[in-house]
């Protein structure tokens, strides 16, 4: 029984016999937080969600009214037996990923879900304050490893200890204070390098001073706001790869074709503003490196009047971003010419990722600094690629199919030929746990509302009978979850008072 079925049954019972007075008792609250009920023999099991992302399982005996707690696995087994009468498998794999998160800091308040970066900045600043010497050593090592294609950034090998860093910070700030605020890095590079500092602190002496003072403040008295500002000024991303294998990915003539819609527009807009942001940040930090963005998708020989058969395509409105297309191949190595549904592409993704890796390394001349996956297939490809290249991985789901199809996990076998949910849900589970951070558009996407389950939350506990059951698949309190709303294109949406930009 679903939440609505349980609520309707309670309402009907109260309508028929209002004398019981259950309307104003704790039992009504119990019914309201019941998400699901299963009936097995004389027992009725309930999955309770008393508040956002909090779950409990209990069961009642219909004759004795005895109530007791149920284990997650036990509740899932009852569901399995309802789908397959008499089914019993004591050896079905169970997945509980809780132990893998024990050593990592976790959020505790449901209102904080999706604010992972803010939480980690607070946690890190607290650690820097509590373990002063260890934290300062960590910051020093962090700054020492920064480089781009062999070019050192931030610090050179003249600074080897924290005490030396303190001394050189004072000297560098004293020196920069004597220079005009608009003096460029190129004009002060030699003396700054003699102190142990490389490019990356700012383009002008004023910007360099601001960044150096932020570092001094962080070293002296760590504060999460100063730490966030300082980290935001450090150049870390010079090149990135965006993966979106399915559909017809192109800049024109693709919308309306199978598996092709809003995700394409989202990524193309994202690329334009990501490149601009990357360029501006690098420029302001005094680094003359052109950022590179590669959108990696599938090459489709039967392109149906689109550019999806072109291996390389520049993205309009960008300085240097490109679409890189890699074909799907069968086990014999032959290119698959026709479009393939997003539900049927799973056998091709591993070979696609290996081929994409070679092309990406050739174009970029090295590893990217960040890999962003999109949708289930792109996120799995991002997982495979990031593990091979040892690069930070970001996931963007766009839509998780599990919540779009009612009981798609429980009845996966019925839909397997058409949708291959067994592969997709497994890919989702792997990718979301492997990701370094996950971007969601809204809080509801992660943890739902007080009355509905979130898309990611639906992966916490579920079963696919005769395949495997998940006791704890993902922790929505993990700080890897971050909410970043898509926003709006300022070239399209602007104040009505800006009349010169309006169409005549």
Mark where each language-model region is.
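Catalytic cores of nucleotide-sugar-dependent glycosyltransferases that transfer UDP/GDP/TDP-activated
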Residues: 1-504
């Amino acid at each position: 029984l679903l939440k609505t079925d349980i609520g309707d049954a309670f309402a009907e019972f109260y309508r028929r016999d209002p004398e019981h007075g259950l309307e104003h008792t704790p039992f009504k609250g119990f019914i309201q937080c019941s998400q699901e009920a299963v009936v097995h023999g004389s027992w009725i099991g309930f999955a309770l969600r008393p508040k956002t992302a909090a779950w409990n399982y209990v069961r009642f005996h219909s004759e004795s009214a005895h109530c007791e707690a149920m284990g997650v696995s036990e509740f899932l087994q009852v569901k399995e037996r309802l789908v397959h009468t008499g089914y019993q498998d004591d050896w079905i794999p169970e997945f509980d990923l809780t132990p893998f998160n024990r050593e990592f800091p976790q959020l505790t308040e449901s209102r904080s879900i999706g604010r992972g970066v803010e939480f980690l900045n607070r946690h890190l600043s607290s650690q820097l304050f509590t373990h002063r010497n260890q934290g300062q050593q960590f910051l020093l090592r962090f700054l020492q490893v920064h480089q781009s294609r062999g070019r050192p950034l931030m610090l050179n090998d003249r600074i080897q200890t924290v005490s030396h860093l303190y001394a050189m910070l004072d000297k560098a700030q004293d020196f920069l204070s004597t220079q005009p605020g608009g003096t460029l890095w190129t004009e002060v590079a030699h003396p700054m390098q003699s102190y142990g500092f490389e490019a990356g602190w700012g383009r002008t002496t004023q910007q360099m001073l601001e960044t150096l003072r932020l570092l001094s403040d962080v070293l002296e008295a760590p504060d999460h706001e100063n730490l966030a500002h300082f980290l935001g000024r450090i150049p870390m991303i010079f090149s990135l790869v965006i993966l979106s294998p399915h559909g017809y990915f192109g800049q024109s003539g693709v919308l309306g074709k199978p598996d092709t819609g809003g995700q394409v527009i989202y990524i193309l807009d994202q690329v334009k503003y990501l490149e601009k942001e990357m360029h501006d940040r690098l420029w302001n930090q005094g680094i003359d490196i052109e950022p590179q963005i590669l959108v990696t998708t599938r090459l489709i020989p039967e392109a149906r009047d689109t550019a999806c058969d072109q291996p390389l395509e520049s993205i309009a409105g960008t300085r240097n971003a490109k679409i890189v297309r890699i074909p799907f191949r069968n086990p014999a190595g032959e290119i698959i010419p026709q479009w393939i549904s997003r539900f049927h592409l799973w056998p091709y993704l591993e070979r696609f990722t290996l081929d994409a890796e070679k092309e990406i390394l050739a174009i970029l001349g090295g590893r990217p600094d960040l890999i962003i996956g999109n949708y289930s297939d792109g996120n799995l490809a991002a997982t495979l690629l990031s593990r091979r290249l040892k690069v930070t991985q970001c996931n963007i789901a766009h839509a998780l199919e599990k919540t779009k199809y009612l009981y798609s996990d429980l009845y996966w076998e019925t839909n397997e030929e058409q949708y291959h949910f067994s592969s997709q849900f497994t890919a989702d589970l792997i990718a979301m746990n492997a990701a370094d951070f996950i971007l969601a558009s809204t809080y509801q996407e992660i943890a739902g509302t007080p009355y509905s389950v979130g898309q990611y939350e639906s992966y916490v506990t579920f079963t696919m009978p005769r395949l495997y059951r998940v006791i704890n698949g993902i922790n929505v309190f993990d700080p890897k979850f971050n909410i970043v709303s898509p926003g709006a294109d300022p070239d399209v949406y602007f104040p009505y008072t800006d009349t010169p930009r309006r169409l005549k």
